[in-house]
Regions:
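Non-catalytic accessory regions flanking glycosidase/transglycosidase catalytic cores in CAZymes
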Residues: 1-200
Length: 200
């Protein structure tokens, strides 16, 4: 329960409110709840996939999951629309956002802490096909994929790069100078047909 008591007549705007626990699994800053992470640990998973599902694509590419927005101080991470915010017209959630409170740095730490191989999932230049079907305007043309390819390369460097590299240094500055030993990378989520295949 969060309780904020204010006195006076001026208005107050709260920019960032977090109810993340302080007492986290392995005492990680901005880490997972102890009970949830312990349950994951007790299952001995071989692989931990993140992020899951259609959130990778977003309902449009503007709202796709972008890993670079999920690192750095939590209070500086931007909000993003959630893929499920307006998918079903009978079930609108206009205030349902992603906070990126759990980002890729915390994800890599969690995988390490529970002994699982991380399997990050990155966008392949396609918005959610279920929502956009085969509308080519909802997807990046194949000859314009370079920024998406670079995001994949940068994530690999963030996870495994030496501390003298741009993204390896960022990882070290966040408190983890040793590489995370990333071995796997998924590109795209639940896509199909030639729109997807031509991007591989």
């Amino acid at each position: 329960c969060l309780r904020v008591l204010l006195s006076g007549t001026r208005s107050v705007a709260l920019e960032h409110v977090s109810l993340f626990p302080v007492n986290t699994f392995k005492n990680r800053e901005n880490g997972m709840r102890r009970d949830l992470a312990q349950a994951l640990y007790d299952m001995h998973p071989g692989v931990l996939r993140f992020p899951g599902g259609c959130i990778v694509e977003g309902e449009s590419l503007k709202h796709r999951y972008q890993w670079k927005n999920t690192i750095g101080p939590v209070e500086n991470r931007p909000l993003n629309n959630n893929r499920w915010q307006s998918t079903f017209h009978y079930r609108l959630f206009p205030d349902y956002y992603q906070s990126y409170g759990l980002g890729f740095f915390e994800y890599f730490q969690l995988a390490e802490d529970i002994g699982a191989e991380p399997l990050p999932v990155l966008n392949v230049g396609m918005a959610c096909q279920f929502q956009n079907w085969d509308n080519p305007k909802a997807h990046v043309p194949v000859d314009s994929l370079q920024p998406y390819i670079q995001d994949c390369l940068d994530l690999i460097e963030f996870a495994n790069g030496d501390t003298c590299t741009t993204w390896g240094r960022k990882r070290a500055e966040m408190g983890h100078p040793a590489p995370f030993n990333l071995k796997y990378l998924a590109v795209g989520n639940e896509q199909w047909n030639t729109l997807y295949y031509e991007r591989l």
